[in-house]
Amino acid sequence: MRRHLQWSIKQLTASYSDGQLSPRRVTEDALQDALRWKTLNAFVRLTPEQAGQQAQDAEQRYKLRQPISDLDGVTIAIKDNFCTKDVHTTCASRMLQDFVPPYDATVCSRLKQAGAVILGKTNMDQFAMGAGTVDSLYGPTKNIWSEDLNKDHWRIAGGSSGGSASAVAAGLCYAAIGSDTGGSTRNPASYCGVVGLKPTYGLVSRHGLIPLVNSMDVPGIFARSVSDCVAVLNTVAGPDKLDSTTIRQPFTRLHLPEVGQIDLSTVRIGIPKEYHCHGLSAEVLETWSKVADLLECSGASVRQVSLPNTAASIFVYTILNQCEVASNMARYDGIEYGHRATDERSTEQLYALSRAEGFNDVVKTRILTGNFLLLKKNYDHYFEKALRVRRLIAEDFARVFDSSAKEERVDILLTPTTLTEAPLYKDFASLTNRDQCAVQDFCTQPANMAGIPAVSIPIRLSQAGLPLSLQLMSNSLNEQLLLTVARWIEAQVEFDSLEHSQQYKASL
């Protein structure tokens, strides 16, 4: 066992400063472990030469006692839908299999400017359309908590950012970047027993993130602790002139209080009754209740609230998702860029065959459905109506967070992240992608619809020895309080993703 795997990012960089460890050694260990854990299929591409140079540069800065940030020399992985200069960015699809961007996504450039070591690109559902990381050109990603990684008893890692979650859970990197459109960071974080943060929409630049649903896409952060998530957020957040949707006001770095200094007496916690839904497992419900009791016993005000339009949220999300997908996928025509078919008898034939060969069935289905919903005869009935209901969903959150009646207002919402523990692949694959997303995204997509921040934190193990997590949501730009409460809960439950994971069931 590599002892530094149990350290936080702050402890790791302190060890660089005092000479206990070096960025090059940690990077070499990480690359070796990534190859040793190839069966997880967390990475689709490692970048050892680039990572080695970044680690060497960081090591030189520490020798000169001139580290440039809290992430200098820290190993990080990037989901394969973020553009990385001179490194393939494929969205796990044949359509972009040969695409090498000439520029970095803003998130990636800010990490590099901070001295982070980028290990490589992580697996995902094709074009981020999925909830299991099983619909990838490179094959499915496995969950390190699986009973057996080599037989039929392996568990999914969640999706669509399952590769990033799996890499962090296995100790292959200290943090990873994912994307979150309807829960694609929080869902795999829940299943893999790590922290997954979806920031406020517009807080982190989407420039260079290949779009799925422009109005909901948010870069997400994976780490093994809340404080590590904060370290990454402090690096990547803030206005970006290359993304007009970023919030213009300057970002104020977050500084979380020490656990012993956190006072919950003024914190109001809401329990949305609509999240007690069909399919919620008894163990998740018990976990939810116990954490609510823990918060109340520690001085927080806890009460039930109602978000009445939650029941419609998954349907509205599905409609809007498919409509925006149809629009975003139109650019992949085999002519301008992307996979190009060999049959060039006509422009129409080239266009049709390139898309037929370049997209999998999941992507094709969403494109077809989205175009159907956007037909003139359907536009008002589906798309326009979905937009109106989306506003009602956002107003539900605004009402509980901003209510003029003090007795009705709350600061934080506590809910499940996923309805169950990570399912077996064979059970997950028995349902269609559409049906799985309707189940897996139920608790997570409302935050994307409203644009508010949310974080998933692991709480305990199920009877089957698998992580169970809960989600916290708060008002827009209230990450400080959201992550403070998350840190307090984290300290009480003392969940350690590495201590219990498969990482220590095998010798490294």
Curated annotation (Swiss-Prot):
Enzyme Commission numbers on file: 6.3.5.7
HAMAP family, A to Z: GatA
The keyword ATP-binding appears for this protein: yes
Major subcellular location class: mitochondrion
Summary of the function given for this chain in its UniProt record: Allows the formation of correctly charged Gln-tRNA(Gln) through the transamidation of misacylated Glu-tRNA(Gln) in the mitochondria. The reaction takes place in the presence of glutamine and ATP through an activated gamma-phospho-Glu-tRNA(Gln).
Keywords: ATP-binding, Ligase, Mitochondrion, Nucleotide-binding, Protein biosynthesis
Presence of the UniProt keyword Oxidoreductase in the record: no
Assigned GO CC terms: glutamyl-tRNA(Gln) amidotransferase complex; mitochondrion
Compartment(s) of residence: Mitochondrion
Catalytic function, reaction form: L-glutamyl-tRNA(Gln) + L-glutamine + ATP + H2O = L-glutaminyl-tRNA(Gln) + L-glutamate + ADP + phosphate + H(+)
Annotated source species: Drosophila melanogaster
Residue numbers annotated as active site: 79, 160, 184
A Pfam family matched in the record: Amidase
GO terms (BP aspect): glutaminyl-tRNAGln biosynthesis via transamidation; mitochondrial translation
Molecular function via GO: ATP binding; glutaminyl-tRNA synthase (glutamine-hydrolyzing) activity; serine hydrolase activity
Oligomeric and partner information: Subunit of the heterotrimeric GatCAB amidotransferase (AdT) complex, composed of A, B and C subunits.
Similarity-based family: Belongs to the amidase family. GatA subfamily.
Designated name of the protein: Glutamyl-tRNA(Gln) amidotransferase subunit A, mitochondrial
InterPro entries in the cross-refs: Amidase, Amidase_dom, AS_sf, GatA
Gene from which this protein is expressed: GatA
Enzyme class: ligase
Gene3D superfamilies according to UniProt: Amidase signature (AS) domain (3.90.1300.10)
